[in-house]
Regions:
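Extreme N-terminal starter segment of soluble prokaryotic enzymes
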Residues: 1-4
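Short polar catalytic/cofactor-binding loops
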Residues: 7-13
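Cys-nucleophile CN-hydrolase/nitrilase-fold catalytic domain and related Cys-dependent amidase chemistry
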Residues: 14, 23-101, 170-190
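Structural motif
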Residues: 34-35, 137, 161
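CN hydrolase (nitrilase-like) catalytic-core segments centered on the catalytic cysteine
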Residues: 65-79, 146-228
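Active-site catalytic loop in hydrolytic enzyme cores
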Residues: 87-157, 174-183, 239-257
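Residue-level detector of high-confidence beta-strand sites
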Residues: 95, 105-110, 164, 222-223, ...
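C-terminal beta-strand edge segments of enzyme domains
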Residues: 129, 201-259
Length: 259
């Protein structure tokens, strides 16, 4: 399956973000991409960096944008995962919307909340596991990368690839944080023996990679930091090598003992 990730400077304008996402979808479809992912809160902006709070989002406009995106996805026969904000009654969630050709939209709501997230959002409860073009895909959002437990849930369900949407930036060029987040991602890939695709916004300074790591945590492709761009990769290596088989066997043994 050809997969893609698009990094860009997320803004406070739903219309602007939609136009960037629309162009990226059309470009990705022309490149034969079947699954395209975008950063955390890519449609709405992230509170309070881009918008004052989750409650100021124009949800009527957002619903119209979802409909426009669904038409675009039907036309281009592509699966898309986009960061957004979800409202249910008076509760708001930091969410990923999963859009598939000619199917109902699905959501994953972020569980690990702290700081600005806790100020603006409620804790989600969904598994974050979706079937996309014959693959079992796990979805997690930003801060969750720091907790192996959230990824062990995905391992237990034998996901083929895990996706992490980030809005992780700094006001200074913090390469140390970038490397730290990258280390977390590589560890999650290794310990769960699962390809891991990540995507981040780019402004002011990007502090998480837009990249793909293999089942042993090795980087397969990584975009240049702080520049808008499209990552493209043909992912077809789901067979386990000798070391990966060992990690699966021991992981399953340890999990049985814990459970």
């Amino acid at each position: 399956m050809r997969i893609g990730a698009y990094q860009f400077a997320v803004s406070n304008s739903i219309n602007h973000n939609y136009e960037v996402i629309k162009k990226a979808i059309i470009r990705a479809s022309a490149d034969g991409i079947k699954l395209l992912v975008f950063p955390e809160c890519a449609l709405t902006g992230y509170p309070p960096r881009d918008i004052e709070s989750s409650s100021v989002v124009d949800f009527q406009k957002l619903d119209k944008v979802y409909d426009q995106l669904q038409d675009l996805i039907n036309e281009n026969e592509i699966h898309v995962i986009i960061g957004t904000i979800f409202r249910k009654d008076n509760e708001y969630y930091n969410s990923a919307i999963i859009l598939k050709p000619n199917q109902d939209k699905q959501f994953y709501h972020k569980k690990a909340l702290w700081g600005w997230d806790r100020d603006n959002f409620c804790v989600g409860s969904e598994s974050g596991i979706f079937e996309i073009d014959g693959c079992k895909v796990g979805v997690r959002i930003c801060f969750e990368v720091r907790f192996p437990e959230f990824f062990r849930e995905l391992y237990m369900d034998r996901t083929n690839i895990n996706i992490i949407l980030f809005y992780d930036v700094a006001d200074i060029d913090d390469e140390e944080r970038y490397d730290l987040i990258k280390a977390h991602i590589r560890t999650r890939a290794v310990e769960n023996i699962t390809h891991t695709l990540t995507v981040d916004t780019i402004s002011p300074y990007q502090t998480a990679p837009t990249a793909l790591y293999d089942k042993s945590g090795y980087p397969l492709i990584e975009l240049k930091r702080n520049e808008e761009g499209l990552l493209v990769y043909d992912l077809d290596d789901f067979e386990l090598d000798f070391g990966e088989k060992g990690r699966v066997e021991v992981s399953d043994w340890v999990t049985e003992k814990v459970v």
